[in-house]
From Swiss-Prot:
Subunit and interaction comment: Interacts with HSPA5; may regulate the function of HSPA5 in apoptosis and cell proliferation.
UniProt topology in membrane: Single-pass type I membrane protein; Single-pass membrane protein
Positions of the MRH domain: 652-854
SUPFAM superfamilies from the UniProt entry: Growth factor receptor domain (SSF57184), Mannose 6-phosphate receptor domain (SSF50911)
GO biological process: autophagy
Gene: Elapor1
Organism annotation: Mus musculus (Mouse)
Full protein name: Endosome/lysosome-associated apoptosis and autophagy regulator 1
Length: 1009
């Protein structure tokens, strides 16, 4: 023991005199130890440190790559006389897997039995609690101040250890799992994860000691798989971060992470004991093996121990459980394959693994097997062989499950798969069980055949997923479908099913393309009666259809609800490449040297069943692409629409006409033909997550091509525009997507999720409020006041869901508003801020000047001015308010030459004068004519007086009784103008006779009057 004031290490004070340069950190440690001894020198005497009271550590590496090994006490101040520092191994030194670095002699030694090591790495595979060094943090996203009082706290939203793995949060909070590690050399981090739900954002990234993130190539997790990321030398902080945003009632499924392994730590000073349920029988083991079923092990075991006869255990168990008595929930029934006599046997089997005891009190016995029944017929398209097996009919023939029959002339087989008899599992189907505890496949049978249906078998636990998969290599759609770029339907799958459940069971239907991860399409919860479901395949690729049934989501083992089952009665897939046929359909005939053969009709042509010839569909009709037989296959288009070039769809060419008794209103919506977007009002979840619905619309034109695109970028926020990648993209006339703003998530781009098609087919365009069952309530929007009725576009979606059994519908109401320049303004119903009041029927109001009718001559006034200085102007002005757009232009002002009032007055006087002269001339003319008649009459009177003379008979007219005798004598002698006027003014005598002087003709006798 050193005396007070004496320093046993003078070199600590005079380090500059030594010839060997000792690292500064080493001198600091030595000086601290000496000072510590001097300070306590007056206290009780300390004993020399034993090997169990200290451990060795390396100092930090210097610039030359060197380090020192120093002894560090477990509890400072309890002992003294620690070993002197010695030069350590190189900083890059490491041991192999299965070895550890013995710090006492600084050499690698193999791990003992029951232990393992990764050499230069560490592994985390036990998650009963959060391992040392890990941290789980949670945080709210952007929370609106107005709802802060009702916002739930996020402090409990963290990653939760669950034994074999750690699970993420499932709410709208952000949960982060962190681990910091210092690497002596470049290494990797490797982990397995289960990422089943796209409504969760899952990202993994690494930051260095300057808090700078590494390249984000692997930041966004795409699918369930094993992942690894390279790590740089130095400090690395690993982040696993999740954020759920299921804005609907659906509860997201958590992300699961397990088996995290990190390499590059340079050395491991000890081996890790095998966790319970595993063992390592040999020295130098890099990993521990799982105990088989009905065996168990404790921590650090070299072998597994068998369970007692009355106990059992699952694979990798640390304890054995008491076997319960067998019940009817522990066995299931199935059917054997048909024998040579065409019979099948009903067989009862214990569920695997068998955990119950038959000999226990109250245990049930396995029912007797072997009851024979007649085999059901083969599935359509198959025939029964001599040994009672079913084989597919060759191409060109069909069957209903019995014998194969060649298709008649003029027909071709309708290939597909139709399964409705379940005596054996079809060759293109397989079944398995996925553990609901550790999410590993167990290699068990998940579905069993039962004659007229297939049902879920008994699993190892009620939360296991009973999986059934059907793989289709590809499709062979009709040529008319291939030519139609807008009709994406290449095939359909229809299945009939039911579920019988006593708790919260779930049946999932999933679809995977080209071996990619299955995407959930539809989910049914609880008991569902026997019903049919149809899904449309829109991509010609290798497709896998998966049905997964889970009896309960509770995280516990046991069989309590084995009577909860899912049954599938039939599965029908159309247009399958290499499929079989249950019937033959008519085809178009093509003449050849070998006779007639089937061929495809051109797009838009239907097949005449009798002649096998192709005929073009009439105008304004479309062809049923998958049933092009007969004239009835041509379906009329709705009002206001027309067919495209190949008669595959009805569309509106951005024009519309409306007839009224007074005029015809024409419309042109070309200014509205592009895509437009509309965001709904912001909403908030219970955790305060801000989101809104975003709509994209394409109204008309483009030959009916769907222009609105909505994308799900949750699984990969880095995909370029136009590339599908792992994202789900929806193309329609109207689509909807849920958007979380970029300022909320902290990403460069906003997060879009759950794209939905709202309009796949244009039903018609009309001013009516109802069309083919689709209603556009006028009361949803403020009433129009212009007097011009709204034009309504009626759309329908092909998506059929449980809540929307008839599919979704969309109405877009176009309203004339001269104050809204094109393209105008889109509005949502005020009482339904998300565009729908029931989740199935969506409504939009589009106000624009482009929605007004085209201008015509009826839309302007004509004003004619007075004649000023010989000029008259004609002016045209629009009627107010102007409720038209486009069409004819307002005519320019017209200027014409005109005559003043003075001119017309002169014309009138001249015309009057001429008229007076004309009347005078006419008067004279008729007067003269009258004088001639007067003369003739006078002559007749003179002849009448010669009664008794021998004169010739008078040439006169008879005088009727009561008539006056008036004789006018016409004098042959000419008179002057004055004499004519005087004669004209003479008057008759009072007795009614005129005094006429008579002149006797020459040579005649004198007569007395």
């Amino acid at each position: 023991m050193a005396e007070p004031g004496h320093n046993p290490h003078p070199s600590a004070r005079d380090g500059g005199k030594t010839e060997r340069r000792t690292p500064r950190l080493l001198w600091l440690l030595l000086w601290a130890g000496t000072t510590f001894q001097v300070t306590l020198g007056t206290g009780p005497e300390l004993h020399a440190c034993k090997e169990s009271e200290y451990h060795f550590e390396y100092t930090a590496c210097d610039s030359t790559g060197s380090r020192w090994r120093v002894a560090v006490p477990h509890s400072p101040g309890l002992c003294t006389s620690l070993p002197d520092p010695v030069k350590g191994t190189e900083c890059s030194f490491s041991c192999n897997a299965g070895e550890f670095l013995d710090m006492k002699d600084q050499s690698c030694k193999p791990c003992a039995e029951g232990r393992y090591s990764l050499g230069t790495g560490i592994r985390f595979d036990e998650w009963d609690e959060l391992p040392h060094g890990f941290a789980s943090l949670s945080a709210n996203l952007e929370v609106d101040d107005s709802i802060s009082e009702s916002t739930e706290n996020c402090t409990s939203s963290k990653w939760v250890p669950r034994g074999d793995y750690i699970a993420s949060n499932t709410d709208e909070c952000t949960a982060t799992l962190m681990y910091a590690v210092n690497l002596k050399q470049s290494g990797t981090v490797n982990f397995e994860y289960y990422y089943p739900d796209s409504s969760i954002i899952f990202e993994f990234f690494v930051q260095n000691d300057q808090c700078q993130p590494s390249a984000d190539d692997s930041r966004w997790m795409k699918t369930t798989e094993k992942g690894w990321v390279e790590l740089n030398r130095g400090n690395n902080v690993l982040y696993w971060r999740t954020t759920a945003f299921s804005v609907w009632s659906k509860v997201s499924k958590p992300v699961l992470v397990r088996n995290i392994a990190i390499t590059g730590v340079a050395y491991t000073s000890e081996c890790f004991p095998c966790k319970p349920g595993t063992y390592a029988a040999k020295q130098g083991s890099p990993f521990c093996k799982l105990c088989p079923a009905n065996y168990y092990s404790n921590k650090g075991e070299t072998s597994c121990h068998p369970c007692d006869a009355d106990k059992y255990s699952e694979k990798g168990s640390s304890t054995c459980k008491v076997r319960p008595a067998c019940t009817d929930k522990d066995y299931f029934y199935t059917h054997t394959a048909c024998d040579a006599q065409g019979e099948t046997q009903l067989m009862y089997k214990w569920a695997i693994p068998k955990i119950c005891g038959e000999d226990l009190e109250g245990a049930v016995k396995l029912p007797a097997s072997g009851v024979k029944t007649r085999c059901p017929p083969c599935n359509p398209g198959f025939f029964k062989t001599d040994n009672s097996t079913c084989e597919p009919c060759p191409y060109g023939s069909y069957s209903n499950g019995s014998d194969c029959t060649h298709c008649p002339a003029g027909t071709e087989p309708a290939v597909g798969f139709e399964y409705k008899w379940w005596n054996t599992l079809p060759s293109n189907m397989e079944t398995t069980v996925l553990s609901g505890i550790n999410f590993e496949y167990k290699g068990l049978t998940g579905w069993e055949v039962a004659g007229d249906h297939i049902y879920t078998a008994v699993g190892a636990s009620d939360n296991d997923f009973m999986i059934l998969t059907l793989v289709v290599p590809g499709f062979r759609p009709p040529q008319s479908v291939v030519a139609d770029t807008e009709n994406k339907e290449v095939a359909r799958i229809t299945f009939v099913f039911e579920t019988i459940c006593s708790v919260n069971c779930e049946l999932y239907f999933m679809v995977g393309m080209n071996s990619r991860t299955n995407t959930p399409v539809e989910t049914w919860k609880g008991t569902k009666g026997k019903q049919s479901y149809t899904y449309t395949i829109e991509e010609n690729a290798t497709v896998s259809f998966t049905w997964a049934f889970q009896r309960t989501t509770l995280h516990e083992t046991g069989r309590k609800y084995t009577n909860d089952v899912a049954k599938i009665y039939s599965i029908n897939v159309t247009n399958v490449m290499g499929g079989v046929a249950s019937y033959c359909r008519p085809c178009a005939l093509e003449a050849s040297d070998l006779g007639s053969s089937c061929t495809s009709c051109p797009a838009g042509h239907y097949i005449n069943r009798d002649s096998g010839t192709c005929h073009l569909c009439p105008s304004n009709t479309i062809l049923k692409a998958h049933q092009p037989y007969g004239a009835q296959a041509c379906v009329p288009c709705g009002p206001g629409t027309k067919n495209n070039k190949i008669h595959s769809l009805c569309y509106n060419d951005c024009t519309f006409s409306r007839n009224t008794p007074s005029r015809i209103f024409n419309y042109n919506f070309s200014a509205l033909a592009g895509t437009v977007s509309l965001a709904g009002v912001p909403s908030f979840t219970s955790k305060g997550l801000k989101y809104f619905h975003h709509f994209t619309l394409s109204l008309c034109g483009n030959q009916g091509k769907k222009m609105a695109v909505c994308t799900d970028n949750v699984t990969d926020l880095r995909i370029p525009d136009g590339e599908a990648g792992f994202s789900k993209s929806v193309t329609a006339y109207v689509c909807q997507v849920v958007i979380i703003p970029s300022e909320v998530m902290g990403y460069k781009a906003g997060v879009s999720s759950q794209p939905v098609s709202l309009a796949d087919r244009l039903v018609g365009v009309s001013t009516d409020m109802t069309l083919e069952g689709i209603v556009s309530p006028v009361e949803l929007f403020h009433p129009e006041t212009s007097g011009i009725p709204d034009i309504v576009f009626f759309f329908r979606s092909n998506d059929v869901t449980q809540s929307c059994s008839s599919g979704r519908s969309t109405t877009i109401r176009l309203r004339c508003n001269p104050m809204k320049a094109a393209p105008g303004t889109l509005r949502l119903p005020s009482m339904c801020s998300d565009g729908t009041c029931d989740g199935c029927n969506f409504h939009f109001l589009w106000e624009s000047v482009a929605a007004c009718p085209l201008c015509s001559a009826s839309d302007y006034h004509t004003f004619v001015s007075s004649c000023v200085a010989g000029i008259q102007k004609t002016t045209y002005m629009w009627r107010e308010p102007k409720l038209c757009s486009g069409g004819i232009s307002l005519p320019e002002q017209r200027v014409t030459i005109c005559k003043t009032i003075d001119f017309w007055l002169k014309v009138g006087i001249s015309a009057g004068t001429c008229t007076a002269i004309l009347l005078t001339v006419l008067t004279c003319y008729f007067w003269k004519k009258n004088q001639k008649l007067e003369y003739k009459y006078s002559k007749l009177v003179m002849n009448a007086t010669l009664k008794d003379c021998d004169l010739p008979a008078a040439d006169s007219c008879a005088i009727m009784e009561g008539e006056d005798v008036e004789d006018d004598f016409i004098f042959t002698s000419k008179k002057s103008l004055f004499g004519k006027i005087k004669s004209f003014t003479s008057k008759r005598t009072p007795d009614g006779f005129d005094s006429v002087p008579l002149k006797t003709s020459s040579g005649g006798p004198d007569m007395d009057m």
